[in-house]
């Protein structure tokens, strides 16, 4: 199947509760906004072969009592357009996030009445938020949260992936449904050490719903953001599950060490999705982080 071009990508319907922005190359990007418009923005950037649905309705509702939540669907994922290009470009990923921030009306940290957004990247979302910070800087961002995140697709310590992620290359890009299902089932199982079956099946389903070409393009780019992280001046929180077999816990520690003043928190009962596996603690850590900004 040929990937859809930006010009033919459907805009999400208003009835879906999803809004849309248009990136610099014409790709339609979907996002959801929840919570008090006057609250501090929390921008959620999901991981590889996932979407804004990854966070789950219960967590999104809980976050919406604390923040103005902006949950993004990355290009090629969820309700966003499936562009043919742009997946290997740090500048394009930065343009995508900038388009969503513009459309959602997120002001800069120094603007009157604005405190700046918290940017939260989960898994591959750590690369995307780093792309944004490298290109656009910290002007709109008050704080950074990395959750089970990689910040590189390279030999950088911040890009250390585990066996569950490496196994994806053996069939996770296949168009044959049987091959893809068999491979991604293992990936989905590794996502969570605990948690309900509904959440686990949702995560698995989102991986299958992401076009095979998109799954491949994200993982065949080459990028690292070691210098980006070392140059940050905003507060940062790094959360990582101690049983993560998708992105190794060592990546979380390395990322925290590279960011000046970052706080690292290991979640002892979690694998790759601490926000679903240890939700009360995840919320408490976010509350404490936001209170210090």
Question: Which functions belong to the PLM regions below?
Answer:
Residues 27-83:
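Conserved HGGG/HGGXW glycine-rich cap/lid loop of the alpha/beta-hydrolase fold
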Residues 57, 71-120, 124, 284:
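Active-site loop/oxyanion-hole signature of alpha/beta-hydrolase fold enzymes
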Residues 130-175:
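Flexible "cap/lid" loop of the alpha/beta hydrolase fold
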Residues 155-156, 175-230:
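Conserved alpha/beta-hydrolase catalytic His-Asp/Glu region
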Residues 232, 238-240:
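Short beta-strand/loop motif that positions the catalytic acidic residue
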Residues 234, 248-257:
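Short alpha-helix in the alpha/beta-hydrolase fold that links the catalytic acid
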Residues 243-247:
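Acidic catalytic loop of the alpha/beta-hydrolase fold
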């Amino acid at each position: 199947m040929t990937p859809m071009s930006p010009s033919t990508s459907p805009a999400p319907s208003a009835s879906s509760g999803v809004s849309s922005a248009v990136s610099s190359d014409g790709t339609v990007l979907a996002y959801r906004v929840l919570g008090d418009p006057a609250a501090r923005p929390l921008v959620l950037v999901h991981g590889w072969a996932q979407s804004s649905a990854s966070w789950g309705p219960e967590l999104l509702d809980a976050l919406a009592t604390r923040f103005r939540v902006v949950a993004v669907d990355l290009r090629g994922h969820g309700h966003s357009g499936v562009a043919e290009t742009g997946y290997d470009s740090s500048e394009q990923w930065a343009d995508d996030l900038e388009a969503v921030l513009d459309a959602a009306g997120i002001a800069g940290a120094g603007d009157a009445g604005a405190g700046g957004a918290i940017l939260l990247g989960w898994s591959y979302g750590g690369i995307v938020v780093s792309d944004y910070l490298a290109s656009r800087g910290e002007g709109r961002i008050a704080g950074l949260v990395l959750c089970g995140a990689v910040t590189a697709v390279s030999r950088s310590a911040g890009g250390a992936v585990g066996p569950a992620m490496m196994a994806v290359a053996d069939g996770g890009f296949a168009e044959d449904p049987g091959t893809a299902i068999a491979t991604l089932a293992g990936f989905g199982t590794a996502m969570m050490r605990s948690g309900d079956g509904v959440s686990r099946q949702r995560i698995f389903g989102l991986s299958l719903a992401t076009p095979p070409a998109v799954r491949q393009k994200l993982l065949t780019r080459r990028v690292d953001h070691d210098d980006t992280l070392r140059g940050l001046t905003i507060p940062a929180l790094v959360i990582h599950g101690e049983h993560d077999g998708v992105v190794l816990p060592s990546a979380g520690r390395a990322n925290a060490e590279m960011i000046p003043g970052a706080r690292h928190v290991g979640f002892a009962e979690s694998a790759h999705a601490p926000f679903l596996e240890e939700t009360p603690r995840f919320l408490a850590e976010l509350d404490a982080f936001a209170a210090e900004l």
